[in-house]
């Protein structure tokens, strides 16, 4: 289990992980790592939240929010934001399904992708600032948001098909079963309940689950399935929806 965690941490983040810690794990077994996604999100969110807390007293909530979001982007290497941009470029191109998938593979940033990046990053900064002004616990909120967003991404993997012939998303999409999905969502729910007691966190998670489920169905209808890019988009939007639901 520890090898699986370190392998997933290395796979979906840019945090330094010694190779020997995940050595011997076959790539085809990575799908079992979905259950570690909420824990990895918890770690990323906690680090980002600590940055906010350290900087808030020095430069105020808005700049602290800016740098906490920046740290989150750096820790993931912009991996999920890239998926969000590619997804928006493809889906909003209003082309044929095959052409949409082709556009999503293009490394160049389009207008729709650029606008999506600006909106999501700016919205996160503003929501974090507002939560801080309302006296909400930012460390707990960010840790929960990152855990829940990565946990609910399982909704785009379970009983979905991969929209392409090959790619990194094929490791997870259509490869996880009902038990793994339930365990992943259950862990995310536990983190939400513990970090944000009084059902506030669980209620925000339910809102996020509904939003991500609807997103998955819309993408399935538009693209014929999911890709690694759509998983990244779901994680980014899941973080934002969860934080908005806390307001």
From Swiss-Prot:
Per the record, GO CC terms?
Answer: plasma membrane
Q: Which pathway?
A: Cofactor biosynthesis; adenosylcobalamin biosynthesis; adenosylcobalamin from cob(II)yrinate a,c-diamide: step 7/7
Q: Which cofactor does it need?
A: Mg(2+)
- Where is it located? Cell inner membrane
Give the transmembrane region(s). Answer: 34-54, 59-79, 113-133, 138-158, 194-214
The UniProt record lists the keyword Manganese:
no
Keywords noted in UniProt: Cell inner membrane, Cell membrane, Cobalamin biosynthesis, Magnesium, Membrane, Transferase, Transmembrane, Transmembrane helix
Primary localization class, coarse: membrane
- GO molecular function terms attached to this record: adenosylcobinamide-GDP ribazoletransferase activity; cobalamin 5'-phosphate synthase activity
The record's InterPro entries line, in alphabetical order, gives: CobS (IPR003805)
Q: Does the keyword Magnesium apply?
A: yes
State the annotated membrane topology for this chain.
Answer: Multi-pass membrane protein
Any single biological process term in GO: cobalamin biosynthetic process
Q: Which reaction does it catalyse?
A: alpha-ribazole + adenosylcob(III)inamide-GDP = adenosylcob(III)alamin + GMP + H(+); alpha-ribazole 5'-phosphate + adenosylcob(III)inamide-GDP = adenosylcob(III)alamin 5'-phosphate + GMP + H(+)
Q: Which domain of life is it from?
A: Bacteria
For this protein, what is the EC number?
2.7.8.26
Please give the Pfam families that the UniProt record associates with this protein: CobS
NCBIfam families associated with the record: cobS
- Name the family: Belongs to the CobS family.
Function, as annotated, reads: Joins adenosylcobinamide-GDP and alpha-ribazole to generate adenosylcobalamin (Ado-cobalamin). Also synthesizes adenosylcobalamin 5'-phosphate from adenosylcobinamide-GDP and alpha-ribazole 5'-phosphate.
Instruction: Spell out the protein name for this chain.
Output: Adenosylcobinamide-GDP ribazoletransferase
Q: Which organism is it from?
A: Escherichia coli O45:K1 (strain S88 / ExPEC)
The lineage, from the top, is: Bacteria, Pseudomonadati, Pseudomonadota, Gammaproteobacteria, Enterobacterales
